[in-house]
Amino acid sequence: MGKSNSKLKPEVVEELTRKTYFTEKEVQQWYKGFIKDCPSGQLDATGFQKIYKQFFPFGDPTKFATFVFNVFDENKDGRIEFSEFIQALSVTSRGTLDEKLRWAFKLYDLDNDGYITRNEMLDIVDAIYQMVGNTVELPEEENTPEKRVDRIFAMMDKNSDGKLTLQEFQEGSKADPSIVQALSLYDGLV
Protein backbone atom coordinates (compact mmCIF):
# COMPACT_ATOMS: atom_id res chain seq x y z
CA MET A 1 0.00 0.00 0.00
CA GLY A 2 2.61 2.58 1.14
CA LYS A 3 4.79 2.92 -1.93
CA SER A 4 2.09 2.39 -4.54
CA ASN A 5 -0.07 5.17 -3.05
CA SER A 6 2.69 7.66 -2.31
CA LYS A 7 2.63 9.24 -5.78
CA LEU A 8 -0.07 9.97 -8.30
CA LYS A 9 0.32 8.77 -11.88
CA PRO A 10 1.60 11.56 -14.15
CA GLU A 11 -1.60 11.53 -16.24
CA VAL A 12 -3.71 11.97 -13.09
CA VAL A 13 -1.52 14.86 -11.92
CA GLU A 14 -1.82 16.44 -15.37
CA GLU A 15 -5.62 16.08 -15.35
CA LEU A 16 -5.94 17.55 -11.84
CA THR A 17 -3.63 20.42 -12.76
CA ARG A 18 -5.94 21.17 -15.70
CA LYS A 19 -9.07 21.00 -13.53
CA THR A 20 -7.72 23.03 -10.59
CA TYR A 21 -5.75 26.15 -9.77
CA PHE A 22 -2.89 24.06 -8.37
CA THR A 23 0.50 23.37 -9.95
CA GLU A 24 1.74 19.80 -10.46
CA LYS A 25 4.00 20.17 -7.43
CA GLU A 26 1.12 21.42 -5.27
CA VAL A 27 -1.14 18.57 -6.40
CA GLN A 28 1.59 16.08 -5.43
CA GLN A 29 2.09 17.79 -2.05
CA TRP A 30 -1.64 17.78 -1.30
CA TYR A 31 -1.83 14.13 -2.34
CA LYS A 32 1.02 13.21 -0.02
CA GLY A 33 -0.78 14.87 2.89
CA PHE A 34 -4.12 13.35 1.91
CA ILE A 35 -2.67 9.82 1.82
CA LYS A 36 -0.88 10.42 5.13
CA ASP A 37 -4.19 11.36 6.76
CA CYS A 38 -6.30 8.92 4.72
CA PRO A 39 -4.16 5.85 3.93
CA SER A 40 -7.11 4.19 2.18
CA GLY A 41 -7.17 7.06 -0.31
CA GLN A 42 -10.68 8.03 0.80
CA LEU A 43 -12.21 10.15 3.52
CA ASP A 44 -15.58 9.29 5.04
CA ALA A 45 -18.00 11.68 6.74
CA THR A 46 -16.77 10.78 10.24
CA GLY A 47 -13.15 11.51 9.32
CA PHE A 48 -14.21 14.77 7.69
CA GLN A 49 -16.06 15.80 10.86
CA LYS A 50 -12.96 15.08 12.95
CA ILE A 51 -10.96 17.47 10.77
CA TYR A 52 -13.56 20.21 11.28
CA LYS A 53 -13.52 19.62 15.04
CA GLN A 54 -9.82 20.52 15.04
CA PHE A 55 -10.62 23.90 13.48
CA PHE A 56 -13.68 24.59 15.64
CA PRO A 57 -12.95 23.13 19.09
CA PHE A 58 -15.33 25.47 20.95
CA GLY A 59 -18.45 24.66 18.97
CA ASP A 60 -20.03 21.64 17.33
CA PRO A 61 -19.10 21.50 13.63
CA THR A 62 -20.66 18.06 13.04
CA LYS A 63 -23.75 19.25 11.16
CA PHE A 64 -21.90 21.83 9.06
CA ALA A 65 -19.09 19.39 8.25
CA THR A 66 -21.72 16.92 7.01
CA PHE A 67 -23.18 19.55 4.67
CA VAL A 68 -19.71 20.44 3.33
CA PHE A 69 -18.85 16.75 2.98
CA ASN A 70 -21.92 16.27 0.78
CA VAL A 71 -20.72 19.00 -1.61
CA PHE A 72 -17.16 17.60 -1.73
CA ASP A 73 -18.56 14.11 -2.43
CA GLU A 74 -19.38 14.84 -6.08
CA ASN A 75 -20.23 11.25 -7.04
CA LYS A 76 -22.34 10.76 -3.89
CA ASP A 77 -20.69 7.46 -2.88
CA GLY A 78 -20.27 8.47 0.76
CA ARG A 79 -16.51 8.95 0.44
CA ILE A 80 -14.26 11.76 -0.73
CA GLU A 81 -11.53 10.61 -3.07
CA PHE A 82 -8.46 12.77 -3.60
CA SER A 83 -9.69 14.14 -6.94
CA GLU A 84 -12.95 15.34 -5.33
CA PHE A 85 -11.02 16.82 -2.42
CA ILE A 86 -8.48 18.74 -4.51
CA GLN A 87 -11.09 20.11 -6.92
CA ALA A 88 -13.30 21.42 -4.09
CA LEU A 89 -10.26 22.82 -2.30
CA SER A 90 -9.19 24.57 -5.49
CA VAL A 91 -12.54 26.35 -5.88
CA THR A 92 -12.86 27.30 -2.22
CA SER A 93 -9.28 28.50 -1.85
CA ARG A 94 -8.33 29.90 -5.26
CA GLY A 95 -11.50 30.13 -7.29
CA THR A 96 -13.00 33.33 -8.60
CA LEU A 97 -15.75 34.99 -6.58
CA ASP A 98 -18.37 33.55 -8.98
CA GLU A 99 -16.91 30.03 -8.62
CA LYS A 100 -16.96 30.34 -4.84
CA LEU A 101 -20.54 31.58 -4.93
CA ARG A 102 -21.62 28.68 -7.17
CA TRP A 103 -19.93 26.30 -4.73
CA ALA A 104 -21.61 28.00 -1.75
CA PHE A 105 -24.95 27.80 -3.58
CA LYS A 106 -24.50 24.02 -3.89
CA LEU A 107 -23.81 23.91 -0.16
CA TYR A 108 -27.05 25.73 0.68
CA ASP A 109 -29.19 23.94 -1.95
CA LEU A 110 -29.54 20.83 0.18
CA ASP A 111 -31.97 18.99 -2.10
CA ASN A 112 -30.16 20.01 -5.32
CA ASP A 113 -33.31 21.42 -6.93
CA GLY A 114 -31.63 24.61 -8.13
CA TYR A 115 -33.10 26.83 -5.40
CA ILE A 116 -32.24 27.72 -1.83
CA THR A 117 -35.35 27.73 0.33
CA ARG A 118 -35.65 29.55 3.63
CA ASN A 119 -35.55 26.17 5.45
CA GLU A 120 -32.41 25.07 3.60
CA MET A 121 -30.67 28.30 4.47
CA LEU A 122 -31.87 28.00 8.06
CA ASP A 123 -30.37 24.49 8.27
CA ILE A 124 -26.98 25.77 7.09
CA VAL A 125 -26.96 28.97 9.14
CA ASP A 126 -28.02 27.03 12.24
CA ALA A 127 -25.15 24.59 11.59
CA ILE A 128 -22.72 27.52 11.28
CA TYR A 129 -23.95 29.03 14.55
CA GLN A 130 -23.50 25.63 16.25
CA MET A 131 -20.02 25.34 14.77
CA VAL A 132 -18.72 28.71 15.97
CA GLY A 133 -20.41 28.33 19.35
CA ASN A 134 -20.01 31.33 21.62
CA THR A 135 -16.71 32.38 20.06
CA VAL A 136 -18.32 35.05 17.85
CA GLU A 137 -20.30 37.96 19.24
CA LEU A 138 -23.18 38.62 16.88
CA PRO A 139 -25.11 41.87 16.50
CA GLU A 140 -28.63 41.90 17.96
CA GLU A 141 -30.24 41.75 14.50
CA GLU A 142 -28.36 38.53 13.69
CA ASN A 143 -28.02 36.79 17.05
CA THR A 144 -30.21 33.86 16.01
CA PRO A 145 -30.13 31.78 12.83
CA GLU A 146 -33.74 32.83 12.12
CA LYS A 147 -32.89 36.55 12.28
CA ARG A 148 -29.88 36.05 10.01
CA VAL A 149 -31.92 34.11 7.44
CA ASP A 150 -34.73 36.72 7.54
CA ARG A 151 -32.15 39.43 6.86
CA ILE A 152 -30.55 37.49 3.99
CA PHE A 153 -33.89 36.69 2.36
CA ALA A 154 -35.07 40.31 2.72
CA MET A 155 -31.95 41.39 0.87
CA MET A 156 -31.64 38.61 -1.75
CA ASP A 157 -35.13 37.30 -2.57
CA LYS A 158 -35.94 40.03 -5.10
CA ASN A 159 -39.17 38.46 -6.37
CA SER A 160 -40.32 37.43 -2.85
CA ASP A 161 -41.09 33.85 -3.86
CA GLY A 162 -39.48 32.35 -0.75
CA LYS A 163 -36.56 30.81 -2.59
CA LEU A 164 -33.29 32.01 -4.05
CA THR A 165 -32.05 31.25 -7.54
CA LEU A 166 -28.33 31.06 -8.24
CA GLN A 167 -28.55 34.52 -9.81
CA GLU A 168 -30.32 36.05 -6.78
CA PHE A 169 -27.79 34.39 -4.48
CA GLN A 170 -24.81 35.62 -6.49
CA GLU A 171 -26.12 39.18 -6.87
CA GLY A 172 -27.19 39.40 -3.23
CA SER A 173 -23.90 38.00 -2.00
CA LYS A 174 -21.88 40.43 -4.11
CA ALA A 175 -23.94 43.33 -2.74
CA ASP A 176 -23.10 42.35 0.85
CA PRO A 177 -19.45 43.14 1.69
CA SER A 178 -19.58 40.85 4.74
CA ILE A 179 -20.43 37.85 2.53
CA VAL A 180 -17.66 38.67 0.05
CA GLN A 181 -15.23 39.07 2.95
CA ALA A 182 -16.38 35.80 4.53
CA LEU A 183 -15.78 33.95 1.26
CA SER A 184 -12.27 35.39 1.14
CA LEU A 185 -11.52 34.51 4.76
CA TYR A 186 -12.77 31.01 4.07
CA ASP A 187 -10.01 30.49 1.51
CA GLY A 188 -8.46 27.11 2.08
CA LEU A 189 -10.36 26.46 5.29
CA VAL A 190 -12.73 24.11 3.55
UniProtKB/Swiss-Prot annotation:
In terms of CDD domains, this protein maps to: EFh
More info: Binds 3 calcium ions via the second, third and fourth EF-hand.
Lipid-acceptor residues (N-myristoyl glycine): G2
Similarity comment text for this entry: Belongs to the recoverin family.
Q: Is Cell membrane among this UniProt entry's keywords?
A: yes
Q: Name one GO cellular component term.
A: plasma membrane
What is one process in the GO biological process aspect for this record? regulation of signal transduction
The record's InterPro entries line, in alphabetical order, gives: EF-hand-dom_pair (IPR011992), EF_Hand_1_Ca_BS (IPR018247), EF_hand_dom (IPR002048), Recoverin (IPR028846)
Q: Which residues bind Ca(2+) 3?
A: D157, N159, D161, K163, E168
List the source organism.
Answer: Xenopus laevis
> Where does the UniProt annotation locate this protein?
Golgi apparatus; Postsynaptic density; Cytoplasm, Perinuclear region; Cytoplasm
**What highest taxon heads this organism's lineage?**
Eukaryota
Protein's name according to its UniProt entry: Neuronal calcium sensor 1
Molecular function (Gene Ontology), one example:
voltage-gated calcium channel activity
Annotated Ca(2+) 2 binding lies at D109, D111, D113, Y115, E120
Q: How does it sit in the membrane?
A: Peripheral membrane protein; Lipid-anchor
Q: Where does Ca(2+) 1 bind?
A: D73, N75, D77, R79, E84
Expression (tissue specificity): Brain.
